Amino acid sequence: ATLSQVAYFEQRHPTFRVDLIEASERSDYVDHILSWAADNISSGPIGVSTSVDVKSLKITQGKLGRQGAADLADRILGEVASGLHLLGVRKFVVAGGETSGQVMNALGVKQLAVAGFDELSGGYCHQAGTEPTSFVLKAGAIPKDDFFFIAIERMREADMRG
């Protein structure tokens, strides 16, 4: 489901597709992503995705190992989230349980206010404080292709309600 959701999102918003094999060979790969992000965030929501089709996944796992690929993807997304936060991003939609944990750790999130689940089954969360940050933490296979659009809109609505 996530792969089709990323493809749907990508039709209207810039999306960086992470190449884990390239990332494993470049020490500056996260900086490369953040440079791309800095050039694109002024236009609105952006995406950074490690999701790939089955064929590409097998190639990547063949080179990096299953756990190695997963760990690298989570580490990169955590570091990118931290860098995006430094660039002023305060709304994040994160897909996957392990990735969500990595992003929370990378951002130093210690406490969240959690809203109830709705028909999207997305975990809407907010971190209060001097730099309030909102999250939608997407569990596994939620079948709505427009999930990311709905999640972003829900965070905007929450901001307007205060």
Residue ranges and their predicted role:
Residues 1-162:
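Active-site catalytic microenvironments in core metabolic enzymes, especially phosphate/sugar-handling
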